[in-house]
């Protein structure tokens, strides 16, 4: 079975995916970064923590996973890791939380 590549989405498309695919929004930033605000409905799993690769096994591999970080670097790596672990529908937010917020999209402070 071919592995689907991670698809990078801009904030507009990320919003549509979040609403239409009812995906799980995964925030892979640190707890310190999360204090400054999150995208509504996100769950946090810090990509830099050693147990990250164990924690993702708790997630449903058939569910749509929408990943974001601060600027898009860690979310890309986290998304690749999800795909390697058999997740089928993985997307990440290009430009991360900063681009999302600066583009005027809603955040939970």
Model regions and ranges:
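Rhodanese-like catalytic fold shared by cysteine-dependent sulfurtransferases
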Residues: 1-23, 31-64, 73-109
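Short, surface-exposed ligand- or partner-binding patches at beta-edge/loop junctions that are enriched
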Residues: 68
């Amino acid at each position: 079975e071919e592995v689907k590549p991670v698809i990078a989405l801009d904030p507009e498309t990320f919003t549509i995916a979040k609403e239409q695919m009812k995906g799980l929004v995964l925030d892979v930033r640190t707890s310190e970064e999360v204090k400054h605000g999150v995208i509504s409905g996100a769950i946090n799993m810090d990509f830099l923590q050693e147990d990250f690769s164990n924690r993702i096994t708790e997630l449903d591999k058939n569910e749509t996973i929408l990943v974001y970080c601060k600027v898009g670097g860690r979310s890309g790596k986290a998304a690749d890791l999800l795909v390697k672990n058999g997740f089928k529908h993985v997307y990440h937010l290009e430009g991360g939380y900063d681009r999302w917020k600066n583009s005027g999209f809603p955040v939970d402070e």
